[in-house]
Curated annotation (Swiss-Prot):
Quaternary structure and partners: Component of the ISW2 complex, which at least consists of ISW2, ITC1, DLS1 and DPB4. May form a stable subcomplex with ITC1.
Protein name: ISWI chromatin-remodeling complex ATPase ISW2
Molecular function in Gene Ontology: ATP binding; centromeric DNA binding; chromatin binding; DNA binding; DNA translocase activity; helicase activity; hydrolase activity; nucleosome array spacer activity
Organism in which the protein naturally occurs: Saccharomyces cerevisiae (strain ATCC 204508 / S288c)
GO CC annotations on file: CHRAC; chromatin; chromosome, telomeric region; nuclear microtubule; nucleus
Gene that this polypeptide is encoded by: ISW2
C-alpha cells in the first residue's frame, strides 16, 4: 500500500460527515465487510487491506469477469438493440415531462410495436384520469368524500410514494467523500445531482455551464459517483482536445486518485501496445484520448461496451457530417455526456446535431426539429415557440453563468481599445486596397467573388496588426531588434505603454493573437524590453505545452507575459495566476475569444480580471467586432433567455465581407484615416475605449432577434454603406461615387463608350459631374463568354466564334488596348496617351528599352485585331447557339465522376450497369455521352488519370470474374460443399487462426452473394452472426469487416494458385483426401453439426487442424 493511500485512509477515518451520498456508500461497504453503518460513516473509500488491490494483486477471476463486461462479444449496433428497456423508460419519462416529445417518439413508434403499446397505455391512463375528474366535476359541488373513498386515495398515494422512494436515487446535499483535495461548491453539487438524475432516467445530456465554472470537476465527481455508489467501474471514454489531455489526467489524480486513468496517445507502436495489453484486457477504468486518436483507433475503441462517452468541447461535433461525429456514433455506449461552454454558435440546427448525438432515437429528423421553431410574426406565436424550446431543452441542457452562481469570482472588465494606424500601416492599407480596387468596389463575379474578398480581408487584418507581417516590409538586412518594432504599428505603441504600466502594478499578462507570426514579433519585443515570457502556439509539442504552463503558474514565477495563439491556447488551460488578458486581434468566432479570456477568468482567480481587446479604428476590425457582438447577442437570446426562433446562419457572406472591406476605405484614400503617434496618451485612449465599448454593448443589448437577422443589426445598413453614408444606387437622380485610387483620377470624354466606365455604371459608380437633367447614354452589354468545362465537350469551332464576337464588340465601343491588357499589371494601365507615354518611360527605366518596345508592339497588334475585326452577323449568332446546344452543358463534375467510377466498376462496355448507376441522367443521355467521351477523351485535362482508373477497374473486374468462376466450379464439384470442399492450404500454415469450417463457410457465403455484390463483407458478417454453427465461436464472431475481407482474399488466392498449378496440387489433393476420409470429426465440430438442421454428423474435417488452432482463438495475427 502506498503512503498516499495510507494518508487518505487516515483522513477518512477521522472524518465524521454524514451526507446522504456517503450513507449510501457506507451501506454498500457494510454489506461487503460485515460491519455496522455507524462504523462506516464517511469511509466510502476505506476497504479492508484485502480489498485494496494494485493492478498486479487482482486475482485472475476478477480480470476475466471484468474483461467480459468491458469487451463486446457482438457488433455495437446489435448490442444497442439489447437496451430497449432503457429506451422505453426514457420515452416514458420524456412524455411525462411534456407531450411535445410525442412528435418525435411517434415516428419511432411506427417501427416498434412496444413503443406503440407504451403510447396507448399512457393515453389510456390519461383518459381514466380525465373521466375521474369529469365525474367529480359533474357531481354536486357540495359532494364530500366518503371514508372509503378517502382511504382508497390515501392508500394509492402511499403506494406511489413507496415506489418512488425505492426508485429515487440518493440526493447529494454536500461534497461527497470520494472527492479528495477539496470540496464541491454548492452549484457544483447541484450539477452533480442533475447528472445523477439524467443517469437514473436513462438520459444523456449537455453540461453547458459557462467556461470556468468547473465542468471538469463536476464530470469527474459524477464518474466517481457511478464507481463508488452505483458500483459501475467503467469503462468510461473521455474525448478531449489534444491540448487538455494532461490537464484531465491531473484533475482525476487530484480529485479521485484511486480511479485507474489511462491516456491513449503516442505513436503507432505505442498505441498498439496500449490497445493490446491494457484496453482490450480491461485494465483501466477511464480512458482519456483526443479527437484525432479516436479517428485513428476507431476499430479498437468500437469493441468496448462503454458505460459513458464524455466529449469535452462538444461543439466540435456540431456538424453531424464530420468524420468525428460519424465515427463516435458507431460506438456502443449506455449514455453520453457533452461538455461545452458554447452550446450555440451559429444556429439551432447545430443544437439539433448535439441532441441527435445524445438521443438519436428521439432527435432523428432535423427537418422535423426545425419545423417546430418556424416562427410567424405574431407575438403569440413567439411565446409558444419560447415555451416549446424550454420544454425540449430542460431535460437535456444545464446552462449557468458565473454572474448567477459564482459570487466570489469578480466579473471581468472588458474594454475595446481603439487604436489608430501609423504612417507605414496607412500606406500598406491603401496599397492593398488599390491592388484589387475592382473587388473593393464590388465588381467581382459570383464564382470567385467570396474567395477573392476573403483574401483581401485577411491581408487587411494583417496590416492592422503589424506591417512586418508582409514580406519586404521590415527594413533590412541586416534585421535589428529595435524601436522600429514598436513605432511602425499602432497596436504595438499602445501595447508598449500598457505593459509598462501593468508591470509597475505587479500584474501578469496573457496576450492572444490568431497569427503565430505575430507572436514571433512579440517575442522579439519581449526580448527587447527584457520581459520574461512563455509561448504556446499550434506547433508547440504536448510536453513543451505542459512545461510552459507549469513554469508560468509556479509560485513566485518571474514570467510576466504569456504569448498564445487564440485557437491553440484558448482550450483547457488554467492560467489564473494572470489577471490581465490582451486580445491583440479578434477571432471570427467570438466564442474562441471568450475561451481565451476564461483562461484567467475562472474559479481560483482572486483578482479582478481586465480584458483589453485591440481594435484598429475606422478599419476592417471595427466591423469584425460588430459581427462578434451580434453573434454573442444571438447566443444570449436563444439559450440563456429562451427565445427559440429558428435563426439563419451568421456566416460571412460576400456582402458581409464587402461591407467590412469598404468600411473606412474612402477615408484612407482621402487621407482622413485615424493616426496614432508615439506620444499618444494611454489614459485618453483607454477612456475613449471604455466609452465606445459601453455604446457598442448598449446598442446590441437593445436588439431583438428580428433585428439581429438584418445585415448587421443597425438600422438598415447594407453592403454599400460606410461612414454613415449609403452608397447604394437608389434612383437615377442620385449618382453614386466610385472609390478611386489616390494616385490619379481617370478622365474620359462622355461622347464615346468606355468598357471601364460601362462597368462602373453597372456596379453603381459614375462621374461626379453627372447632372440630374442630362441623361447618360446607355452602354451596350458586353457579350457573355461561355467558359465550359473540358468534360462538357464544347465544339472547337465555338472558341473561334466567341473570339470574333468579343473583337467585334470592342471595335463597336472604340476600346483602346492598354498595357494592363497585356501584362495584367494595374500599374501599367493608363487612361490617355500622355499617361501611357509616361508609363512607357518608367518601363524603359526598369526593364530596358527592349521590354518597352516589345510591350508597345504587342499593344499595337491587339489594337489592330480590334480595328480590323469583321462584323458578327446574325448567322454567326445562330451558329453559336447551335454549337452550344451540342455540348453537354447539363453535365456537372459530379455527373462526370459518377460516369468515370461506373466505367471503372463495371467496365466501359457494360452500358446497362453504367446507365443504372447514374441516377441524375436518363439512359439515353448516358449512352450519348459515353460515345462522345471515348471519341474525345484526350481533350480532357488529365485524361491519362481517368483512363488509368478505368483500366485498373476493368482489370480488377476481370480478376473478380475469374475468381468467381473458379470458386463456383470448385463448389459445384461437391455434393455437400460444407462437408466435402477441400482447401489446399500452403505447407507452412502454422500461424493460421481460422479453422477449416470457418473458411468453408466464408467461401460458400461469397459464392452465394457474388464477389461484386454491394457491401459484401457486411453481409458476410451478418451471415456469421445469424448462423447456428458459430453460436459459441467468439473468434469468428468478433472479426471485423476488414479482417473478413482479408481472409476471403487469402482463400481466393489459394484457389487461383491451385488452378494455376494443377499437376503439383493433384498429388496433394489425393493425399489430403485420403487422410481426411480416415479422420473422425472433432468433438467440437461434431457437436455443431448435430445442432444444425440437414447437417450430417459425419462431416469430414481434420481433427488435428482444429486442435492446432483452438489455443489461437484470442489472438489476432497478421495473415500470411
Amino acid at each position: 500500500m502506498t503512503t498516499q493511500q495510507e494518508e487518505q485512509r487516515s483522513d477518512t477515518k477521522n472524518s465524521k460527515s454524514e451526507s446522504p451520498s456517503e450513507v449510501l456508500v457506507d451501506t454498500l461497504d457494510s454489506k461487503s465487510n460485515g460491519s455496522s453503518d455507524d462504523d462506516n460513516i464517511g469511509q466510502s473509500e476505506e476497504l479492508s487491506d484485502k480489498e485494496i488491490y494494485t493492478v498486479e494483486d487482482r486475482p485472475p477471476e476478477y480480470w476475466a469477469q471484468r474483461k467480459k463486461k468491458f469487451v463486446l462479444d457482438v457488433d455495437p449496433k446489435y448490442a444497442k438493440q439489447k437496451d430497449k428497456s432503457d429506451t422505453y423508460k426514457r420515452f416514458k419519462y420524456l412524455l411525462g415531462v411534456t407531450d411535445l416529445f410525442r412528435h418525435f417518439i411517434g415516428i419511432k413508434a411506427k417501427h416498434d410495436k412496444n413503443i406503440q403499446k407504451l403510447l396507448k397505455q399512457l393515453d389510456s391512463d390519461a383518459n381514466k384520469l380525465s373521466k375521474s375528474h369529469s365525474t367529480v366535476s359533474s357531481s354536486s359541488r357540495h359532494h364530500r368524500k366518503t371514508e372509503k373513498e378517502e382511504d382508497a386515495e390515501l392508500m394509492a398515494d402511499e403506494e406511489e410514494e413507496i415506489v418512488d422512494t425505492y426508485q429515487e436515487d440518493i440526493f447529494v446535499s454536500e461534497s461527497p467523500s470520494f472527492v479528495k483535495s477539496g470540496k464541491l461548491r454548492d452549484y457544483q453539487v447541484q450539477g452533480l445531482n442533475w447528472l445523477i438524475s439524467l443517469h437514473e432516467n436513462k438520459l444523456s445530456g449537455i453540461l453547458a455551464d459557462e467556461m470556468g465554472l468547473g465542468k471538469t470537476l463536476q464530470t469527474i465527481s459524477f464518474l466517481g459517483y457511478l464507481r463508488y455508489v452505483k458500483q459501475i467501474e467503467g469503462p468510461f471514454l473521455i474525448i478531449v482536445p489534444k491540448s487538455t489531455l494532461d490537464n484531465w489526467r491531473r484533475e482525476f489524480l487530484k480529485w479521485t486518485p484511486n480511479v485507474n486513468v489511462l491516456v491513449l496517445h503516442g505513436d503507432k507502436d505505442t498505441r498498439a501496445d496500449i490497445v493490446r495489453n491494457i484496453i482490450l484486457e480491461a485494465r483501466f477504468d477511464v480512458l482519456i484520448t483526443s479527437y484525432e486518436m479516436v479517428i485513428r483507433e476507431k476499430n479498437a475503441l468500437k469493441r468496448l461496451a462503454w458505460q459513458y462517452i464524455v466529449i469535452d468541447e462538444a461543439h466540435r461535433i456540431k456538424n453531424e457530417q464530420s468524420a468525428l461525429s460519424q465515427i463516435i456514433r458507431l460506438f456502443y455506449s449506455k449514455n453520453r455526456l457533452l461538455i461545452t461552454g458554447t452550446p450555440l454558435q451559429n444556429n439551432l440546427h447545430e443544437l439539433w446535431a448535439l441532441l441527435n448525438f445524445l438521443l438519436p432515437d428521439i432527435f432523428g429528423d432535423s427537418e422535423l426539429f426545425d419545423e417546430w421553431f418556424e416562427q410567424n410574426n405574431s407575438e403569440q406565436d413567439q411565446e409558444i415557440v419560447i415555451q416549446q424550446l424550454h420544454s425540449v431543452l430542460n431535460p437535456f441542457l444545464l446552462r449557468r453563468v458565473k454572474a448567477d452562481v459564482e459570487k466570489s469570482l469578480l466579473p471581468k472588465i472588458e474594454t475595446n481599445v481603439y487604436v489608430g494606424m501609423t504612417d507605414m500601416q496607412i500606406q500598406w492599407y491603401k496599397s492593398l486596397l488599390e491592388k484589387d480596387i475592382d473587388a473593393v468596389n464590388g465588381a467581382v463575379g459570383k464564382r470567385e467573388g467570396k474567395t477573392r474578398l476573403l483574401n483581401i480581408v485577411m491581408q487587411l487584418r494583417k496590416c492592422c496588426n503589424h506591417p512586418y507581417l508582409f514580406e519586404g516590409a521590415e527594413p533590412g538586412p541586416p534585421y535589428t531588434t529595435d524601436e522600429h518594432l514598436i513605432f511602425n504599428s499602432g497596436k504595438m505603441i499602445i501595447l508598449d505603454k500598457l505593459l509598462k504600466r501593468l508591470k509597475e502594478k505587479g500584474s501578469r499578462v496573457l496576450i492572444f493573437s490568431q497569427m503565430s507570426r505575430l507572436l514571433d514579433i512579440l517575442e522579439d519585443y519581449c526580448y527587447f524590453r527584457d520581459f520574461e515570457y512563455c509561448r504556446i502556439d499550434g506547433s508547440t509539442s504536448h510536453e513543451e505545452r505542459i512545461e510552459a504552463i507549469d513554469e508560468y503558474n509556479k509560485p513566485n514565477s518571474e514570467k510576466f507575459v504569456f504569448l498564445l495563439t487564440t485557437r491553440a491556447g484558448g482550450l483547457g488551460i488554467n492560467l489564473v495566476t494572470a489577471d490581465t488578458v490582451i486580445l491583440f486581434d479578434s477571432d471570427w468566432n467570438p466564442q474562441a475569444d471568450l475561451q481565451a479570456m476564461d483562461r484567467a477568468h475562472r474559479i481560483g482567480q482572486k483578482k479582478q480580471v481586465h480584458v483589453y481587446r485591440f481594435v484598429t479604428e475606422n478599419a476592417i476590425e471595427e466591423k469584425v467586432i460588430e459581427r462578434a457582438a451580434q453573434k454573442l447577442r444571438l447566443d444570449q437570446l436563444v439559450i440563456q433567455q429562451g427565445t427559440g426562433k429558428k435563426t439563419a446562419s451568421l456566416g460571412n457572406s460576400k456582402d458581409d465581407l464587402l461591407d467590412m472591406i469598404q468600411f473606412g476605405a474612402k477615408n484612407m484614400f482621402e487621407k482622413k484615416a485615424s493616426k496614432v503617434t508615439v506620444d499618444a496618451d494611454i489614459d485618453d485612449i483607454l477612456k475613449k475605449g471604455e466609452q465606445k465599448t459601453q455604446e457598442l454593448n448598449a446598442k446590441y443589448q437593445s436588439l431583438g432577434l428580428d433585428d439581429l437577422q438584418k445585415f448587421n443589426g443597425i438600422e438598415n445598413q447594407s453592403a454599400y454603406e460606410w461612414n454613415g453614408k449609403s452608397f447604394q444606387k437608389k434612383s437615377n437622380d442620385k449618382v453614386v461615387e466610385w472609390i478611386n485610387p489616390s494616385r490619379r483620377e481617370r478622365r474620359r470624354e462622355q461622347t464615346t463608350y468606355s468598357v471601364d466606365d460601362y462597368y462602373k455604371e453597372i456596379i453603381g459608380g459614375g462621374s461626379k459631374s453627372a447632372s440630374k437633367q442630362t441623361p447618360q447614354p446607355k452602354a451596350p452589354r458586353a457579350p457573355k463568354v461561355i467558359h465550359g468545362q473540358d468534360f462538357q465537350f464544347f465544339p472547337k469551332e465555338l472558341d473561334a466564334l466567341q473570339e470574333k464576337e468579343q473583337l467585334y464588340f470592342k471595335k463597336k465601343v472604340n476600346y483602346k488596348v492598354t498595357s494592363y491588357d497585356i501584362t495584367g499589371d494595374i500599374r501599367n494601365e493608363g487612361s490617355d496617351a500622355e499617361e501611357e507615354e509616361g508609363e512607357y518611360k518608367n518601363a524603359a527605366n526598369t526593364e530596358g528599352h527592349k521590354g518597352h518596345e516589345e510591350l508597345k508592339r504587342r499593344i499595337e497588334e491587339e489594337q489592330e485585331k480590334i480595328n480590323s475585326a469583321p462584323d458578327f452577323t446574325q448567322e454567326d449568332e445562330l451558329r453559336k447557339q447551335e454549337l452550344i446546344s451540342k455540348a453537354f452543358t447539363n453535365w456537372n463534375k459530379r455527373d462526370f465522376m459518377a460516369f468515370i467510377n461506373a466505367c471503372a466498376k463495371y467496365g466501359r462496355d457494360d452500358m446497362e450497369n453504367i446507365k443504372k448507376s447514374i441516377d441524375s441522367k436518363t439512359p439515353e443521355e448516358v449512352e450519348v455521352y459515353a460515345k462522345i467521351f471515348w471519341e474525345r477523351l484526350k481533350e480532357i485535362n488529365g485524361w491519362e488519370k481517368y483512363l488509368h482508373n478505368v483500366e485498373l477497374g476493368e482489370k480488377k473486374n476481370e480478376k473478380l470474374k475469374f475468381q468467381e468462376t473458379l470458386l463456383r466450379q470448385k463448389i459445384e464439384q461437391c455434393k455437400h460443399p460444407l462437408h466435402e470442399l477441400i482447401i489446399q492450404y500452403p505447407p507452412n500454415n502454422a500461424r493460421r487462426t481460422y479453422n477449416t469450417l470457418e473458411d468453408k463457410f466464408l467461401l460458400l457465403a461469397v459464392n452465394k452473394y457474388g464477389l461484386r455484390a454491394d457491401k459484401l463483407y457486411e453481409k458476410l458478417k451478418q451471415e456469421i452472426m445469424m448462423s447456428d454453427l458459430f453460436t459459441f465461436d467468439w473468434f469468428i464472431k468478433t472479426r471485423t469487416v476488414h479482417e473478413l475481407s482479408k481472409r476471403v482474399h487469402t482463400l481466393l488466392t489459394l484457389i487461383v494458385r491451385e488452378y494455376e498449378q494443377p499437376d503439383a496440387n493433384k498429388k496433394k489433393r489425393s493425399r489430403t483426401s485420403a487422410t481426411r476420409e480416415d479422420t473422425p470429426l472433432s468433438q467440437n465440430e461434431s457437436t455443431r453439426a448435430s445442432t444444425v438442421p440437414n447437417l450430417p454428423t459425419t462431416m469430414v474435417t481434420n481433427q488435428k487442424d482444429t486442435n492446432d488452432h483452438v489455443d489461437k482463438r484470442t489472438k489476432i495475427d497478421q495473415e500470411a
